[in-house]
């Protein structure tokens, strides 16, 4: 259990280090208006906090920096609520009301807003497909041998897939196929599409569509691609402006992980409605040992759909960043729910 004096000093050190990125000494702490202790007293308390694992001492400095244990305590017990300014709230609202008509467009926009407001990396997971159901399928010819397959889900999500057609598939067969798919697959979960396609739709196609096996194979591949949940990014190079990431090899390792959507999906995905903060080693990814990840979920029509997140240094401006993520998750939920109700 930390004393009140230790709590004040720990909070002062974390706040100063977040602001300056420089180790914090007892003299600079003693100059703060909210600290009334002498430099000698502060030094003793800093030594105790270091011994307890809340602070670390860089080799080349007399000052201290927060450890990951220190950041965790700071986030869990010392963080005061932060309210976005009216200007910041207006900025988010304005960007979200600029003719956004599709779910994916709204999600892409939220990634850009997050990265521009925080100066960190934003990661937004597209709607989870486990419970998402197909509403309708459309096919629009592009050329004599290719069409765009448009999927519309019950949440208003619209996805396009280009399908290349062999010469043996004719327009009449395509029209029949679309009618059969909409009749048989509307309301089916995206994760059950392939199963339904092979068990129920195949028998119907066999009687109505020439070269039905070829059409079936093309549809299977298209449906399989549709099951994947997309990951959207913003500000991937923002970490380059942070002083602790001047090591080229460290940046390379981080960017390599950011290119692996499956890894990022597992790391960012949130199952709860509350803000989640993972610090350093809590991310369970070696390249993210010096990074913190803040996430919140968003919903559509009251149903949990995806996650928005921020990746930044452990020396992150937690108060403001948490507030931005929280505010944006609520605004995105409202926007997507409105789009869902209009669809």
Swiss-Prot record:
Q: Which InterPro entries match?
A: GAF-like_dom_sf, HrcA, HrcA_C, WH-like_DNA-bd_sf, WH_DNA-bd_sf, WHTH_HrcA_DNA-bd, WHTH_transcript_rep_HrcA_IDD
Any one Pfam family here would be: HrcA_DNA-bdg
Gene3D superfamilies with a match to the protein in the record: 3.30.450.40, Heat-inducible transcription repressor hrca homolog, domain 3 (3.30.390.60), Winged helix-like DNA-binding domain superfamily/Winged helix DNA-binding domain (1.10.10.10)
Any one GO biological process: negative regulation of DNA-templated transcription
Listed A to Z, the keywords are: Repressor, Stress response, Transcription, Transcription regulation
**Source superkingdom:** Bacteria
Q: Which family does it belong to?
A: Belongs to the HrcA family.
Q: Briefly, what is this protein's role?
A: Negative regulator of class I heat shock genes (grpE-dnaK-dnaJ and groELS operons). Prevents heat-shock induction of these operons.
User: How is this protein named in the record?
Assistant: Heat-inducible transcription repressor HrcA
To which species is this protein native?
A: Halalkalibacterium halodurans (strain ATCC BAA-125 / DSM 18197 / FERM 7344 / JCM 9153 / C-125) (Bacillus halodurans)
């Amino acid at each position: 259990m930390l004393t009140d004096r230790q709590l004040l000093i720990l909070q002062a050190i974390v706040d100063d280090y977040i602001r300056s990125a420089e180790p914090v000494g007892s003299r600079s702490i003693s100059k703060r208006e909210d600290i009334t202790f002498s430099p000698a007293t502060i030094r003793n308390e800093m030594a105790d906090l270091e011994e307890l694992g809340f602070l670390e001492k860089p080799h080349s400095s007399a000052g201290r920096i927060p450890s990951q244990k220190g950041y965790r305590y700071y986030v869990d017990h010392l963080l005061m609520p932060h309210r976005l300014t009216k200007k910041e709230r207006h900025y988010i609202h304005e960007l979200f009301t600029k003719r956004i008509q599709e779910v994916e467009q709204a999600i892409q926009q939220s990634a850009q807003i997050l990265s521009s407001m925080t100066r960190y990396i934003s990661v937004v997971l597209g709607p989870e497909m486990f419970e998402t159901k197909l509403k309708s399928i459309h096919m629009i010819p592009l050329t004599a041998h290719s069409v765009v397959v448009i999927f519309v889900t019950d949440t208003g999500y619209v996805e396009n897939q280009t399908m290349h057609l062999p010469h043996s598939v004719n327009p009449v067969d395509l029209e029949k196929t679309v009618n059969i798919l909409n009749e048989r697959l509307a309301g089916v979960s995206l994760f059950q599409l392939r199963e339904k396609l092979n068990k129920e739709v195949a028998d119907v196609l066999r009687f109505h569509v020439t070269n039905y096996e070829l059409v079936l194979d093309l549809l299977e591949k298209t449906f399989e691609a549709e099951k994947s949940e997309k990951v959207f990014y913003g500000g991937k190079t923002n970490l380059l402006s942070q002083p602790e990431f001047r090591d080229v090899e460290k940046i390379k390792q981080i960017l390599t992980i950011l290119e692996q959507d499956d890894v990022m999906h597992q790391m960012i995905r949130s199952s709860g409605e509350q803000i989640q903060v993972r610090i350093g080693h809590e991310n369970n990814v070696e390249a993210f040992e010096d990074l913190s990840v803040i996430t919140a979920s968003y919903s559509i029509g009251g149903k949990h759909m995806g996650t928005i997140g921020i990746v930044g240094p452990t020396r992150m401006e937690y108060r403001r960043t948490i507030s931005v993520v929280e505010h944006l998750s609520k605004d995105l939920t409202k926007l997507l729910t409105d789009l869902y109700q209009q669809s």
